[in-house]
Amino acid sequence: MRKGASRDEYVPQHGSRYGTRGTPSRGLADARIRVTKIAAIGMLTLAVIILGITAKTYASERMARSDASTVQTQNKKVTESKATASQTLSTASLKTRLSKADFNDIRSGDTVQTFSLVDDQIPALEDESLAALQDALDQAQELGDAGAVFYDLSSGKGVTYNADAEVYGASSYKALYVLYICESLVETGQVSLDDSLGTYGGYNMGWQTVRDLIEAAVVNSDNDSFIALRAAFDRVGYEDWIVGLGIDYDTALDPMSDFPTYCPRTSAKLWREMSEYLSRDTETSQWLSGLLASTTQSFIRDGIADDQALVRNKAGWISEAGCNATCDAGLIDVGGDTYIMSIMTSMPWSDHSSEVVAAIAKALYDTRAALA
């Protein structure tokens, strides 16, 4: 969102919020009343039809939707790795005994650095790995700011570069906001995935449910769905959730924008929370895990190009004056280990910037042996 302006000054667009909006509780209540009346008069079939034909306006940054076979393959990979990933994450928590506050100890600077959050045994990268990573980062720096964090959940060791570089995150934040909805609202029974949002801020979401909107926002990076979710749920605990995770709400997440500016360190903290949530093995957490594994765009997945790895991510990309970004972050499960990777750059999105972020992801991924 452009700085110096309020949310209400903008018409719907990437990075802005709809001009006016109703209260969340009122919107949900109205939606439930409509659904109840329809069910009472036997028009369930009509509701299903409406659901099926509801128009979807995809994000300006949307890529082509992956075909059904791709999604099916990713969901199968999630199912097959479910037990292993859950066990790995549980073991990692016991082994490292880290809190998200420990991520404050990650080094930050304009050179590639390694770190350990559990002991003083700082890992050393091989010269070839370091050179490949530095080269990819230098390419990104030619087009904008760049920062990255790559972290082994099991060992507590990682690699970092400009961990505090604040970058417009674009749609990379959509998955993290959905984490808030699922973890804080759905799991506690305050919100049902099957609730219809109805009308928010004068924008009619039709009969789309919370489930529909989350899937569209995460898998297809649909902006309208994400903005509708924020309009509905920002005021029912979002700020408390952020602060509770040790995130500086005022500086790390811009309260005036649906698409915040933040840094790789903050991203890593939030994806650590994501890893803990996905390991719970609840119906909602495993559903979200499948969505993250089925995203239509992943520079990380493209970069590491490892069929044995499960990548659960959310990328963000845009080329627009004042809010350029090519970013990606998520979890990588491979060989019984789980890694957090966050790459944030202010490069204007293009085929070239996509390739550069993919190259950074590949170079980071290739350092994992040194982090064991």
Model-derived features: positions:
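Structured C-terminal helix/loop/strand segments within mature extracytoplasmic catalytic/sensor domains
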Residues: 2-140, 158, 166, 278-296, ...
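Short hydrophobic alpha-helical segments used for membrane anchoring or interfacial signaling
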Residues: 148-154
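Active-site SXXK
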Residues: 156, 166-197, 217, 341
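Mid-domain, small-residue-enriched loop/turn segments at the edges of structured enzyme/sensor domains
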Residues: 160, 214, 225-279
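A glycine-rich, coil/turn loop motif that links secondary-structure elements
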Residues: 163-168, 202-206, 253-262
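Short, well-structured active-site flanking segments
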Residues: 183-209, 281-285
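Short helix- or helix-capping micro-motifs
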Residues: 212-221
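A conserved catalytic-loop motif detector
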Residues: 260-319
